[in-house]
Structures are given as structure tokens and as C-alpha cells.
Amino acid sequence: MTTCLRLFFRILSPIRIGCVKLRRLMFPPQAISPVLTAVAMACLAHGVVWAQSTVASTQLPTGGVVSAGQASISQAGSTLNVNQTSQRAIVDWSSFNVGQNATVNFQQPNAQSSTLNRVMDMQPSQILGRITAPGQVILVNPQGVYFGKSSSVDVGGLVATTHTAVADEYLKGQLKFNRNGATGKVENEGELRAALGGFIALLAPEVRNSGVIVANLGTVALAAGEAYELQFDGSGALSNVRVTPATINTLVENKHAIMAPGGLVILSAQAASRLQ
């Protein structure tokens, strides 16, 4: 029997969603109000230990190869620029870490542009510095993605996930992701900011936010499951995340601020059986 909890918040004014933790739960539709109370009380204050190597303050992504679309990669000091001329591009990286004093700029044609970054490293990506883009940045690392306390991401839209993107669908404009055995996690302790009407989506078997996520008139999605499909409305806004239940333990935890005035917040943790 599938167990799940999906919460949708339509935000009419700035809101701070404090401590929310979801772990393979199931409630009937009529129990939604009690669920909100139970989830709010379920927060446990505990840290997360990441098995990760030290990242130099000026560290930048390495080994970038453009495998689809048109883009070039250049570096000047502690700044790396991805100069993209096509609407969509796929870049494969040997590693994707951004040091505290480093910056990665995705120079895309417009706000509807998108760059899929596939990381081949055997270690989680550590984002401790700055990432900017007018359009969408999609960061895929099966080992995990960590946004440190010093990180600052300012983009049109962001997906950080451990799940593999379906490349053919991506190039057609669809955002679909499959776990393919990945067990890494995505955690934010920094500041993730989407452009007006944009989105921030953190997708992994385990998702934690103890930082700040901002998407004015946009969408914030924290989701845990086996597969995901991001669905957009006619205006291009993220309106839903379709989550396939996972075959492993899943968890979504929010311990700090999600601000989406006039927008939507989606929290979804789904698994294929009850937590024992």
C-alpha cells in the first residue's frame, strides 16, 4: 500500500513555514487539518552529517563538456561563465563544487532558457559560493547536493536533485527525473532565490531545508520519491510536481524559512510501504 503525504499551500502573503518534517506518512483526505498540526509538532532538532571533502574557497566546477545544445565555458580567476546561446543545453561535469569565494554565472539567452548540469563525481556537490542565471539551472548529482550557509543562488528557476534527468524529454521541454538507485540527499543551509514567478525545486530521497528559500509569485517544491515530473501551466509557471512513490525510506524536512508570497509551496514525501 502506498504511503504518502502531500501538502500544497497557496501563499497570499509572505510566510515563514517553520519546522515541517515528513517521513513516509499516510493520511486520508478528511484528516488533512489534523495532519498539519501533527506535522508541525513532528520536528526534531538534529543535524545532518555529510561525508564530504574540503572545498577550497575559490573552487569551481571542473571538466565541463557540452553534450547537447550550444554553449561555451570560460574561467576568469574565481569566476566561471557558461555562455549559452541555445534555449536548452546539457553540460556534463567531472565535479561541480563552488567555493565560498567563487561564482558560477550561466549566461543564457532569456528567462525561458535552461541548462541541465549532470555531475559525474563520486562525491556530493558542495555549493558554498554564488550561482546566477536569468533562466533555469538544473543540477543533477546522484551522490547529493549541499548548499552551505555561505551559498547564494539567484536564478530564474532551480532544480537540485539526485535523480537522473530524462535527456530526450528535457530537450523537448519536459522535466522528468528517475532515481535509478540514487540514495543521496539534497540539503539547503544557504539562500536560494528564484526570479519573480520562478521556482525552486529540491528533489531527492531525503530533502532538508534549514536555510532560506524565496520565490515571490512562484513555486517552492521539496519532494522525496522514486520519480518526478515537473508540470507547468500555460504561463510557464511550475504548478505541480508529480511524485512516484519510492521503494526506500523518504523524508522531507523544513526547519527554516520558505517565502513564496502570492505563490505555491509543495511538500511531498512518498514511499511504497509504511515505515516500520
What are these regions, as identified by a protein language model?
Residues T2-Q276:
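Extracellular and secretory-pathway beta-repeat/beta-biased strand scaffolds
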